[in-house]
Amino acid sequence: MVETLLSGIILGLIPITICGLFFTAYLQYMRSGNSFY
């Protein structure tokens, strides 16, 4: 029971962390891109 709960939490956290990393990288890219103009 605990293992399934842990695997569910890990499977739920992995996409959220990946989306967060892409979001922060996108924001930094937009900021650096806007500063060039």
From Swiss-Prot:
Keyword line: Chloroplast, Electron transport, Membrane, Photosynthesis, Plastid, Thylakoid, Transmembrane, Transmembrane helix, Transport
Gene Ontology terms for molecular function: electron transporter, transferring electrons within cytochrome b6/f complex of photosystem II activity
UniProt-listed InterPro entries: Cyt_6/f_cplx_su5, Cyt_6/f_cplx_su5_sf
Membrane topology: Single-pass membrane protein
Protein name: Cytochrome b6-f complex subunit 5
Origin superkingdom: Eukaryota
Entry function: Component of the cytochrome b6-f complex, which mediates electron transfer between photosystem II (PSII) and photosystem I (PSI), cyclic electron flow around PSI, and state transitions. PetG is required for either the stability or assembly of the cytochrome b6-f complex.
Record family assignment: Belongs to the PetG family.
Localization in the cell: Plastid, Chloroplast thylakoid membrane
TM spans (from-to): 5-25
Chief subcellular location: plastid
Assigned GO CC terms: chloroplast thylakoid membrane; cytochrome b6f complex
GO biological process: cytochrome complex assembly; photosynthesis
Quaternary data: The 4 large subunits of the cytochrome b6-f complex are cytochrome b6, subunit IV (17 kDa polypeptide, PetD), cytochrome f and the Rieske protein, while the 4 small subunits are PetG, PetL, PetM and PetN. The complex functions as a dimer.
